[in-house]
Amino acid sequence: MLACKFSQYQAFIMDGVKLLGTCALIILLSTTSTVVGRDRITFTPIEDSAGLMFERMYGLRHHTDDRFVFVKKFNFVSVLQELNNIKSKIELYEAQVSTCTNVRQIKQNRSSIIKARIENQLQFLTQLNKNLITYSVESSILSNDVLDNIDLEYDDSGEFDVYDEYEQPSHWSNMTVSDAQALLRNPPKDRVMFLDTVTTSDVSSKYEEYINCIVSNRTVENECMFLANMMNVLNDKLDDAAALAKMLERIVKQTRKNKLNISNTVIDDDTLLTEMKKLTQTLYNQNRVWVVDFNKDMNSYFDLSQAYKLHLYVDLNTVIMFITMPLLKSTAVSFNLYRVMTVPFCRGKMCLLIISGNEYFGITDSKNYYVPVSDNFRQDCQEFTGYNEFLCPETEPIATMNSKVCEIEMFMGRYSDDVDNMCDIRVANYNPKKAYVNTLIDYRKWLYIFPNTTVSVHYYCHDALVEVDTKVSPGVGVMFSTMAQTCSIRITYDVTITVDSRFYVSHSTTYWPKKKFNFNNYIDQMLLEKATTSFIPTVDNFTRPVLLQLPHKFHIKDYTSTPHHFFHQSKIYTNSAAPDEDSQDDSNTTVVIIAIVAAMILFCGLLLFLFCCIKKRCHQSNNVVVQYKNNNEFVTICNNLEDNRAYINLPNEYDSDDMPKPLYPLLGFNDDLLKDDKPVLYPMIIERIK
């Protein structure tokens, strides 16, 4: 009895242990999944006062105007002639096999079909020979079944727009008709290599001895054997011709895609690499090098086709392939390609935004030289994933010392005394309740701006079925996909981001100079935080095209310089303001006034004197309203266009915000405040530039 109870108790304990173990495992897996999931997308805060941030995207090298050309010929004269002979022999022998039972039958139109396949490719290639050959290919022939054992899977149409004879020959990748004709007519002694020509004479020559043998041994008694052997030979010739037709189709298709592979059976990237390596020293003696560095390891993304351009022409019945490649100077310096991103400096409802002169630039490792890079560099340059770089046309490097370029000076960590003239600083309103996201690297890295509140971010990664909810603190930062993956990130109901980082060679890196630009060194952010303006636009996003359209420029110097007991007029405030009126001191005219009206003239002079004083003190005639907080009190400056006066509003601390005090003119304001050592107001100068 006791043994039975002990056994039950032991079983109960074991079940409890198993249950606890299962729960612990589930919790562990859940925790691990959460940690791994959170590591997939990272959120890194940055200082929003930096003005600009610099993202290294790729390497950058410059190619010369020189190039190297490989030439490969494919002669189809022999096979086209042989196909005509095969057709006539099939017709001849087919009439003699009626009495033989073991002779293989060949459809008479098979040779015509293969011939049509070849001619169909030739007719769409640009002719280099003035004596043009016109091929008339019957569509009914091409629509029949191709009677060979080679599968064809081509979806390309017959229009080969890659062969444009009107291309400009200035770029290494261009090869016009005139270029091709000149090269064939008078080949250069260097930087051109003719590869072995592919001939089609084997279709007839390799069977010649065997055919002579069976013909010489032909007798009446072995007539059926002769016919069987001859039909087998003709069928083998047709198989060879069909293989050549397939080779041509492959060559044409690969030229269209600008990618050679061994499926064409004659030439591929490995063949080119072998020939290039043989010529390395020869080029080096000419102060030139290949794009490929044979001393470096080739990564899994290496693709030689990114460093060549294929061109296909035809000269009578000979197809000619030209493979053009760029050349670099052996002394060429490598650059790092950076993208410049504006970091919004937002306080209250207003943002200050530095716009760089160039969105992209390249700079050497030593940081001694830089080159501007076009916004369209992806079209102007060639990406080479083998080294995670772009190959661009040669550009003269510029010294970074005293560049007087905003983004370069900030990249070098140098402060300028003339920020207003060197940098383009725009001002805009924004919605502090909205979340903003700017793309740094397509589908992989973003700059986020979450102004005032913590944001809940939800993302789901499809490849690992990972779903994560995370909280991101308010501020500015970088959102980054840490691995090759596809995800969907939802930040708010109207902001969704797609992540696809599977095809990136390496991570981009954010660069911060040791001495970063800091808006706080120029601007009192507490004053800016309470400033509001109604005349500048509100932006929906902070992308570069939107920022370039902002019509108002912010002047740091005017903002940080304190007034000397008056509001200095700025002529840049002329959006819709009335023009200034010239005033003249008419005090000298009083000496000629008649004595009987002296009292009246004196009174008028006094009024004129008071008017000039008011105009001098209140010298901003525009419709701008600027509010800010100083010493815990709101001060409102309002300029009226009609009477050209500045007004100050000092609400009582016990008054409601919705019931402001009446405005009092500056003229009636206590002059002791203006004489205080600590100025009560800072001017905010905003220029309309568009």
UniProtKB/Swiss-Prot annotation:
Keywords: Signal, Virion
Signal peptide start-end: 1-37
Pfam family, one: Baculo_F
Gene Ontology CC entries for this record: virion component
UniProt-listed InterPro entries: Envelope_fusion-like (IPR022048)
Main location: virion
Record localization: Virion
Domain of life: Viruses
Function: Pathogenicity factor that accelerates mortality in the host insect.
Name of the protein in its database record: Protein AC23
Organism the protein comes from: Autographa californica nuclear polyhedrosis virus (AcMNPV)
